[in-house]
Amino acid sequence: METLNVDHEDTISSEQEHRAHTKSDTDMPPISGGRDFIRQFAAESKKLWWLAGPAIFTSFCQYSLGAVTQILAGHVNTLALAAVSIQNSVISGFSVGIMLGMGSALATLCGQAYGAGQLEMMGIYLQRSWIILNSCALLLCLFYVFATPLLSLLGQSPEISKAAGKFSLWMIPQLFAYAVNFATAKFLQAQSKVIAMAVIAATVLLQHTLLSWLLMLKLRWGMAGGAVVLNMSWWLIDVTQIVYICGGSSGRAWSGLSWMAFKNLRGFARLSLASAVMVCLEVWYFMALILFAGYLKNPQVSVAALSICMNILGWPIMVAFGFNAAVSVRESNELGAEHPRRAKFLLIVAMITSVSIGIVISVTLIVLRDKYPAMFSDDEEVRVLVKQLTPLLALTIVINNIQPVLSGVAVGAGWQGIVAYVNIGCYYLCGIPIGLVLGYKMELGVKGIWTGMLTGTVVQTSVLLFIIYRTNWKKEASLAEARIKKWGDQSNKREEIDLCEEDENNSNGENNHRK
């Protein structure tokens, strides 16, 4: 019992030291002029890129795992390529949207806890997220098990549905790997352990490429070989990250498994569900764009051209996701440390940087609009349509570089529920109806559908900008402190009370024994 008291006192004193260190790093002073703005901008940019650079690289590497399998499947046969593509985009994509969203709740809590010095609770949050995400994965297994009839219901051919259904069954282990990874990644990002994540992702990608080639093509295992390697690669990322955490890299943020992880799961699940709704409404919105294009008069050309544009859009989105992760970490850290002025300023820095990147990419595409479509298709109709869609693609890239930054702020501040309502109104009550009217009623085809849905994105971005503009950042810092107390301090107090009661019981027992 004495050992427990000593350990607990050490934990409290070390926590106070970290809190004192955090509080000594005071909020930034008001900007006094142009030179001061440039100096503060450069300093904040350095912090953002320190997080965003490795986060972008990690996203590229993990995105490439599925891409490598898909490319090699094309060298097996056409059916294998179709099956892997459908499973990856529809079945797996649906699940990823839900679990990635649920995992973002951890970004809010861990980021704010780290900023406030409540390091011990971060490991508890991680374990709670593991429990909730794996429970969610268990439910999502139904989509994998019944993938064949679901794909047939969506209009896929019997051959593709059957092959994709078989591949989906093989990919169930990856689903649970996602559940572990999405939580672990947020835990590491909150502590700025992004370099380690990048090294792990790059190493796994190299072995994944080699083993996929060996099993799928050289040994002729086909889709089965791809499933084996893809499952193994994702679990290798998970195991390596967990070993890295348990090896002491996270310090007091990881103190081992605890029964505390099973407390207050209902409240944690509510925040996770709000996060999932926010992300899913965004992911499914663009999935609907391709679905609607398949019902146009010339669906082959429309879907082919749109797929090319979506593939191009995917790479800038990886950059935007890196900024999303960096902004959510920095925002939650600063709010947790009660630095409202710095939290507001980093949003300005992230917006300017992200928009600048989007403009450069968009201008490049517009300049090369006569040439780049030939890299993706030999069909003249498809090339012409891609060229016509390039201005919309360029504008979408700029808007999409703004939107993830705003979403990162929302995650960092814990606004997932508010953003979910905004997404429903802007995307599904505004964007999709306008797109359907322009595409079908006014016969503008895929350009009309895309224009309408882009309108929804612009409205959503405008609403988020207005919300952020009207935000009282001092109040948000206070709310972050209250949230940390709700999720952390109360648990620590309960732990202290339990220890004190146990001490008193033991002391009374010893006194009675002496008597």
Curated annotation (Swiss-Prot):
Q: Where in the cell is it found?
A: Membrane
| Keyword Kinase annotated | no
Q: Where is the composition biased (Low complexity)?
A: 506-515
> Per the UniProt entry, what are the Gene Ontology biological process annotations, in alphabetical order?
xenobiotic detoxification by transmembrane export across the plasma membrane
Question: InterPro entries attached here?
Answer: MATE_euk (IPR045069), MATE_fam (IPR002528)
Q: Which segments cross the bilayer?
A: 48-68, 90-110, 131-151, 167-187, 194-214, 225-245, 276-296, 303-323, 347-367, 392-412, 418-438, 448-468
The record gives the membrane topology as:
Multi-pass membrane protein
- Region annotated Disordered sits at 1-30, 488-515
Tell me which domain of life the UniProt entry assigns to the organism this sequence originates from: Eukaryota
Instruction: Give me the Gene Ontology terms describing cellular component.
Output: membrane
GO MF terms, alphabetically ordered = antiporter activity; xenobiotic transmembrane transporter activity
Q: Which UniProt keywords apply?
A: Membrane, Transmembrane, Transmembrane helix, Transport
**Sequence ranges of Basic and acidic residues compositional bias:** 1-26, 488-497
Q: Which NCBIfam families match?
A: matE (TIGR00797)
Cited PANTHER family = MULTIDRUG RESISTANCE PROTEIN
The family assignment reads: Belongs to the multi antimicrobial extrusion (MATE) (TC 2.A.66.1) family.
What name is this protein filed under? Protein DETOXIFICATION 32
The UniProt gene name for this protein comes to DTX32
